């Protein structure tokens, strides 16, 4: 209980005199694993300077324009937009939430939900020089650079969209100034080391 006695969250409340802001599409993922016959979920504590700072959250964030991949079948051969949209209950554009989920998960936790034909990533993280290259891509992503697909192409990967299950849709209450329309997903955490990025996330467990 001591961890929560001084629990504070950085809220930015709405102003009734301001015009309403549109909902921001977002995606987040529950990374779960079996450990000693119990289910564990990875969570990150957001830096106080960020929106909802101080809160413990799942890896995720807003949908980016770069998530709208034109030749998506190359990167997601086992889940297409029609099926993804059907699962979300929308007409089209559903698969973009899966892409955002995977990209944000990698940025915030270092977990890359992707594979190649040898299933190299799901069995363990890159080693040696490959690991250094992957870490450089992550740093560039955190700087706002659009390099996620470069990383995927670099190692000839496909995104594990078919292994990520959609579970819920939450909308931020109207009292908050910045409101999100967030799709929640769940995925088994692969054999990789999950950790916070040290920028938006300052702790993890």
Give the ranges of each region predicted by the language model:
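N-terminal leader/linker segments that precede catalytic domains of diphosphate-processing enzymes
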Residues: 1-205
């Amino acid at each position: 209980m001591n961890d929560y006695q001084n629990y504070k969250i950085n809220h930015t409340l709405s102003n009734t005199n301001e015009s309403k802001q549109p909902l921001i599409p977002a995606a987040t993922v529950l990374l779960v694993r079996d450990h000693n016959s119990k289910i564990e979920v990875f969570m990150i504590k957001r830096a106080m300077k960020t929106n909802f700072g101080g809160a413990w959250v799942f890896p995720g964030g807003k949908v980016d324009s770069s998530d709208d991949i034109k030749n998506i079948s190359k990167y997601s051969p086992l889940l297409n937009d029609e099926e993804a949209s059907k699962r979300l209950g929308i007409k089209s554009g559903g698969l973009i939430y899966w892409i955002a989920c995977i990209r944000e998960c990698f940025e915030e936790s270092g977990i890359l939900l992707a594979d190649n034909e040898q299933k190299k990533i799901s069995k363990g993280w890159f080693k040696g020089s490959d690991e250094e290259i992957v870490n450089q891509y992550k740093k560039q992503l955190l700087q706002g650079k659009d390099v996620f697909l470069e990383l995927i192409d670099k190692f000839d990967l496909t995104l594990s969209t078919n292994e990520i299950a959609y579970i819920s849709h939450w909308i931020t209450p109207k009292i908050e100034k910045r409101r999100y329309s967030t799709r929640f997903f769940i995925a088994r955490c692969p054999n990789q080391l999950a950790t916070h990025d040290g920028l938006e996330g300052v702790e993890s467990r």
